[in-house]
């Protein structure tokens, strides 16, 4: 006689609710051999379902011993029990317990997915099982598109996917019409005939009559047992003791299937998914667009500032000259030029004037200066010639035009040199056009100005010789601070007081950089808060998802999903959700950046590193905030999950 496949000795199961203890099983002893077709019959509350759950390793007894294939299952941990369920048991439930978002083929494949079987094998075997059960033309249908009988056949195919050495059928005909019920019982009889151990749980004596052995249970005790078929017990069916396996699906297969399931689950409620994504999308888009615009602004600032050199100091008057202050004068500029480490000193007077040519009138800046203008600002001519030393001395009526100003006064004329214009109704000769320098660091157009000799402006236009500023070029920028202090001391000696102020290109750059950093910090904080809100949204939606899919968790666990499988499944969904939000955020950020460039003429510079960092931040956010819901799902016991679902 072969040893029993299933041995139960003194099995008890009690449940406590407050101070009330309910005894579902009161010392059940039972042996079932491989290949038997057994029906366990009892009324509602008799303990038959509790007994099935213990036999199927979905629940543990409060007391007693259970051996499967000769091994005490009490020694197995949670994942070892899952492996045993996955490899040896197949479950057929009264309410089918099919996953509604997955096709018939996908439902049948699921046990093999958790076993790590290759996709081609899974597809081939699941198709063969469904075809064998008469569902060849329903493979791609979802459960909602199948009748009750068809859904139960899908459930049977799922139970057989990993072999199904032991088939546990819990009221398999309870939700079916008589014809479908008869068909299901016929399938179970055939499975028993093929060598499967079939355990049928029912309250109906007519259904139980289909089995070869009938066990009756009442009030948690077995009250009758027709006994096993002696021929089956003494048959040559050998029971190979089962060994727990710690093997798991290959990582890539596991990730692929988890991601596939995640996308399917998220597609169920696209509106809710989109709303959950919004926080992550806004956060990532803010980071990408902000950094692109910020980097572009910084590059533009440096480019604009570099157009006229970056090795300068500006000495500016402290306000209008009064009795208590002295104006800046050309003599001050000359004194500065004679100092050590000064390569050029440009006196400058700024004022507005009206330019006229024909019927074209323009109000623009006039810069009155010396030939030092070219040296200090590194500004060459595009057309014509710079004014001469003789022009400076005589104050001749000559003027140079910026590129923008020239194009407005002389539209369609490439070189206006030699032409005459009126400035404040006085005639001036245009001797040349300056090369284009673009916008200043303050955003004003450097090319929309006129330049003339200092003496010319003093004598003919402005009637004053007070300088607006003195621009000083520095030979050695490493001695910038030393030179600034020397200029300051010189002017205090000349003026008798500090009635001026000095700033330099480095300070201007630093100020602009500080402002940019402050702005970026503020926007980064806003983006971080947005992503934090998005992460909390992911956690909330995943908690809701776990609650809504409790039955699915129970089904997956019943068919052999490990704790890591469930944890990974829901954690992957959270990460996929965050990653989708991150990718959409990247695209939106790129659109915002490009839109800013096209609509406002802004320079934008995208950073691959920053974009990847923002995307990784979103993924990390999904991982962190998705862990708690995933962990909660992974800790659900199969029997509890099925009952709550």
Curated annotation (Swiss-Prot):
GO molecular function: ATP binding; ATP hydrolysis activity; transmembrane transporter activity
One Gene Ontology biological process: response to antibiotic
Membrane topology of the entry: Multi-pass membrane protein
Main subcellular location: membrane
GO CC field: plasma membrane
Keywords: Antibiotic resistance, ATP-binding, Cell inner membrane, Cell membrane, Membrane, Nucleotide-binding, Translocase, Transmembrane, Transmembrane helix, Transport
Location within or outside the cell: Cell inner membrane
InterPro entries (alphabetical): AAA+_ATPase, ABC3_permease_C, ABC_transporter-like_ATP-bd, ABC_transporter-like_CS, MacB-like_ATP-bd, MacB_PCD, Macrolide_Exporter_MacB, P-loop_NTPase
Alphabetical list of Pfam families matching this protein: ABC_tran, FtsX, MacB_PCD
TM spans (from-to): 274-294, 526-546, 574-594, 596-616
Domain ABC transporter: 6-244
Annotated EC: 7.6.2.-
Binding site for ATP: 42-49
PANTHER family, per database record: MACROLIDE EXPORT ATP-BINDING_PERMEASE PROTEIN MACB (PTHR30572:SF14), MEMBRANE COMPONENT OF TRANSPORTER-RELATED (PTHR30572)
The protein's assembly and partners: Homodimer.
Task performed by this protein: Non-canonical ABC transporter that contains transmembrane domains (TMD), which form a pore in the inner membrane, and an ATP-binding domain (NBD), which is responsible for energy generation. Confers resistance against macrolides.
Similarity annotation: Belongs to the ABC transporter superfamily. Macrolide exporter (TC 3.A.1.122) family.
Name of the protein in question: Macrolide export ATP-binding/permease protein MacB
């Amino acid at each position: 006689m072969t040893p029993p496949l299933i041995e139960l000795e003194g099995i008890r199961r009690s449940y406590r609710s407050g101070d009330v203890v309910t005894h579902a099983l009161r010392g059940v002893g039972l042996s079932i051999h491989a290949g038997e077709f057994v029906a366990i019959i009892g009324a509602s509350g008799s303990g038959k379902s509790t007994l099935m759950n213990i036999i199927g390793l979905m629940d543990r007894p409060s007391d007693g011993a259970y051996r499967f294939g000769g091994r005490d299952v009490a020694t197995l941990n949670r994942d070892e029990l899952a492996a045993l369920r996955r490899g040896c048991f197949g479950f057929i439930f009264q309410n089918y317990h099919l996953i509604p978002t997955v096709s018939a083929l996908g439902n049948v494949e699921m046990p093999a997915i958790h076993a790590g079987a290759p996709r081609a094998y899974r597809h081939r075997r699941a198709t063969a099982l469904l075809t064998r059960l008469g569902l060849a033309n329903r493979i791609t249908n979802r459960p909602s598109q199948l009748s009750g009988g068809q859904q139960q056949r899908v459930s049977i195919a799922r139970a057989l996917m990993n072999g199904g050495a032991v088939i546990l059928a819990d009221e398999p005909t309870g939700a079916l019409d008589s014809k479908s019920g008869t068909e299901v019982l016929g399938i179970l009889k055939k499975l028993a005939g093929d060598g499967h151990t079939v355990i049928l749980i029912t309250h109906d004596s007519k259904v139980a009559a289909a089995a070869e052995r009938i066990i009756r249970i009442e009030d948690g005790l077995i009250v009758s047992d027709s006994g096993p078929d002696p021929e089956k017990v003494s048959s040559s069916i050998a029971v190979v003791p089962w060994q727990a396996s710690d093997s798991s699906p290959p990582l890539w297969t596991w990730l692929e299937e988890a991601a596939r399931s995640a996308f399917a689950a998220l597609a169920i409620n696209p509106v809710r998914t989109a709303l959950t994504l919004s926080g992550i999308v806004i956060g990532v888009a803010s980071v990408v667009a902000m950094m692109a615009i910020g980097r572009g602004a910084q590059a533009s600032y440096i480019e604009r500032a570099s157009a006229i050199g970056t090795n300068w100091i500006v000495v500016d008057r402290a306000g209008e000259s009064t009795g208590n202050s002295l104006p800046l004068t050309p003599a001050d500029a000359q004194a500065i030029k004679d100092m050590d480490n000064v390569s050029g000193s440009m006196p400058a007077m700024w004022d507005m004037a009206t330019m006229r040519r024909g019927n074209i009138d323009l109000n623009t800046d006039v810069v009155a200066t010396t030939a030092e203008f070219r040296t200090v600002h590194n500004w060459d001519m595009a057309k014509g010639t710079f004014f001469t030393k003789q022009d400076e001395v005589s104050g001749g009526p000559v003027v140079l035009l910026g590129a923008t100003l020239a194009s407005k006064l002389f539209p369609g004329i490439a070189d206006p040199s030699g032409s005459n214009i009126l400035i404040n109704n006085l005639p001036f000769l245009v001797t040349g056009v300056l090369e284009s320098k673009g916008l200043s660091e303050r955003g004003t157009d450097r090319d929309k100005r006129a330049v003339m000799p200092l003496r010319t402006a003093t004598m003919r236009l402005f009637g004053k010789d007070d300088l607006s500023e003195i621009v000083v070029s520095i030979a050695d920028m490493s001695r910038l601070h030393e030179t600034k202090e020397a200029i300051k001391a010189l002017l205090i000696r000349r003026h008798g007081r500090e009635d001026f102020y000095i700033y330099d290109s480095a300070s201007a750059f630093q100020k602009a950089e500080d402002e940019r950093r402050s702005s970026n910090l503020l926007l980064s904080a806003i983006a971080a808060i947005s992503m934090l809100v998005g992460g909390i949204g992911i956690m909330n939606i995943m908690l809701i998802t776990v609650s809504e899919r409790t039955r699915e968790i129970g089904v997956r666990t019943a068919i052999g999903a490990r704790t890591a499988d469930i944890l990974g499944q829901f954690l992957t969904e959270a990460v996929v959700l965050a990653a989708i939000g991150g990718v959409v955020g990247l695209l939106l950020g790129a659109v915002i950046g490009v839109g800013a460039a096209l609509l406002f003429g802004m320079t934008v510079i995208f950073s691959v590193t920053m974009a990847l960092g923002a995307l990784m931040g979103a993924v990390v956010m999904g991982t962190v905030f998705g862990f708690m819901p995933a962990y909660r799902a992974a800790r659900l016991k199969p029997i509890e999950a099925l009952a709550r679902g």
